[in-house]
């Protein structure tokens, strides 16, 4: 055969250095020569045929412009500036998944968890300046004596966390406000089904990939790109960043648990009309509750708990003595709750109210005042009534233990609202209930709910004076009464049922010893557990998780400043051990844009023959020096997104008044109300003050009108 001597391997090839092939230059292709037009020839047609029809030729008309371009001349001096810094969008401590980090970013926490699992952050020109004061960013150009500004864009870079995933979403569409549905829409289970979201997986979820995720965001929608005054532009919202922690590895349940359902406790129906903690109502409710328990079918079995003896018997201060064993040879002859029987000593029940009276009298002079019916030992909401630690689980207390499956909650028929604790009943009323969320699953409705209520009422201690009430037909048993469809149920924590603080501490501070009642403060763990049972929710298995971001804002400063040049004698300059090693280099001098008013800044046109004119000197003398001194921080974070509700959220001052105020405070209020009539001099001073305020308002109105006519007005700022 011819092929048996054929070599089946390739011969060794010699590699030679070749000269790099020169790439020809791209030449523009010339237009081909235009052919000569064919001469027109007349031809005779048959006379008996139909004449040929021609389509009329449409001539192209010049269209009218739909818009024109407006051009604005730049100022004499322009400086392009980048503001680069790092900002923690989310710091989520253990057990804070349900909270909004931006609301709690300025908290001073000692032993509790810090932060929250979601955030709604708004950025404007004030935020970079505040971060510059905190030494968390740097500016490439100074804005001193440059009172104009143009905004271009911003670039965010997110850094991946080792174990926790995050979801980020931007908003450039005005109005930049929050509504009652903002929190539910930011739950990971709902956010995963939305568009234009940015997933930031952890290194455990995606071991490979980029370390950073960059995103560029342009100016806001409906934004006009022209020069603005920095003083007017510093409060204009540029964008809002919404982010939340999530779990992309185990979206429907943690591998460390064997059940996706959660269970919690709610007050029984016996509390329907006895939930008010007002001073004139709590005493009547306490007596009615004790009598109703005694006449109920449960009877004395309500006291069949592990906490009864602890709360009804004082601790002994005597030392234990050795005694002889007196165990009888025969047992089980008598009924005893210690053996799981339903009978409890009737003497204990009769002494219940007496013990509450003694507890109040002995400690009323040595502790903060409150209400004796709300004490933590024998009050209306003590562990004797509400704890699930029963000696015999067959005989429950005056509570309902509820189980909720997040996979079966459709949301139709659900209702969650906020009401004040002095409210008499648990019935929904539009005038006495606020921030209603309905037809939304419970795990989504509770996401950031309490923090939104705090922003609405502008009260950080709102959770201690209000409670969250719900209606849900998707629990077992159903938290819905067909006979009373608008009556809700008050849930509470297991720590509250066992007379413990929300963090599990058994020591009760003096402030809460006679103010022990279910409120939003004692519903924190319930809200957090309900939020974590939803799909893609962060389980809070880490002590702390942080979403670190890097921002790069692009601005252009403009103005017409005076040329300043400072020259020093080089022979008298200070020296150092090493040339150039003068410690920390001084940063660029930055001025607060809020106080960069064009009226209090020198410009080139203020110079007259080398001197400042009298009008410029008079204008500068009117400058206030209050802004030069440091002040305390703002009451609310600069990055907080305002609420979309207009007007005051509190209809009256009586609803915000604490219900446990004693008679001394009432007498003080009555004395304050009974004031003497003002003298004529005081009335004139009051009228003069009002006229000055009116004059300032009119001047501000005409100033804004002038800016609007000159097209220098800024977009409306949400308050």
UniProtKB/Swiss-Prot annotation:
Biased composition (Acidic residues): 664-674
Keywords in alphabetical order: Capsid protein, T=1 icosahedral capsid protein, Virion
Listed GO CC annotations: T=1 icosahedral viral capsid
Renumbered residue ranges of the record's region Disordered: 647-678
Family membership noted in the UniProt record: Belongs to the anelloviridae capsid protein family.
Annotated protein name in UniProt: Capsid protein
Job description of the protein: Self assemble to form an icosahedral capsid.
Lineage: Viruses, Viruses incertae sedis, Anelloviridae, Alphatorquevirus, Alphatorquevirus homin6
